Amino acid sequence: MTEAGRRGDAIGTGQLAIVGLFVTALVTAQLTAAKVLQFGLPFSLPVTGDALVLPGAALAYALTFFGSDCYAELYGKRPAQRLVNVGFVMNFVMLALVYSTIAAPAARSSVDPQQFRTVLGASTNIVVGSLLAYLVSQNWDVIAFHKIREWTDGDHLWARNVGSTASSQAIDTVIFVSVAFAVLPELGVNPELGLPTGVLLSLMVGQYVFKLLVAVFDTPFVYAVVGYLRSRGHVASRPRTAD
């Protein structure tokens, strides 16, 4: 194989790896969103107290922003927007597959159908809240990422990675928690999921603090991925203008 052929294979593999990570993290987030996690802290914070409370999807979902930021940096604004929109459609594919499996008749030797439904069948509140939060926050992430790139003339990748993710994660957190656990229960959709205002704020703050920490600590990995793939010929060495 020629050098050009090897470089072309590397480009294809690297791009597919980012897309694969993005979609895998996104689907995992949907499947783990119903579990609420609680991590004890050695100190007390305003609102959250001595524990961080957050949805089980927080880690997986934070990885989607890592993937989309790498993709936006390497391939541009419009390809990143297409990645986000394809991911949105894949959510519906995943939900269709899960709910069709739940609806299908179970063999006698199978796991209990009700347990299966409980584990994999996310409530309407979780589905609607997460899809709406995804659509708004991920598109904002791409827009903010490229605006910051324009302002910094292509320098300071850390600023656009942290800045775009911090703002988009705030949007995502507020939309998801408020829709799933306040707005829809108030409208009569699974009212048992409704949470008091204090708990809602604690859930929002805990989730956002965790996501913000992930955004800060994943910055060296963004540099590593972008640097490696640029060295393999994925893009011009340092883009100076947004698409």
Which residue ranges define each predicted feature?
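Haloarchaeal acidic low-complexity proteome signature biased toward cell-envelope/secretome components but also
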Residues: 1-20, 229-243
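Alpha-helical transmembrane segments of multi-pass membrane proteins
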Residues: 23-39
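Membrane-embedded alpha-helical bundles of multi-pass transporters/translocases
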Residues: 81-83, 87-94, 100-137, 147-148, ...
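C-terminal ends of transmembrane helices
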Residues: 2-6, 66-78, 222
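Interfacial/capping segments of alpha-helical transmembrane domains
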Residues: 35-47, 53-54, 104
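Alpha-helical transmembrane segments of multipass membrane proteins
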Residues: 27, 31, 69-70, 96, ...
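Structural signature of hydrophobic alpha-helical transmembrane segments
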Residues: 52-63
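Alpha-helical transmembrane segments and their helix-start/interface "positive-inside/aromatic belt" motifs
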Residues: 8-20, 72-87
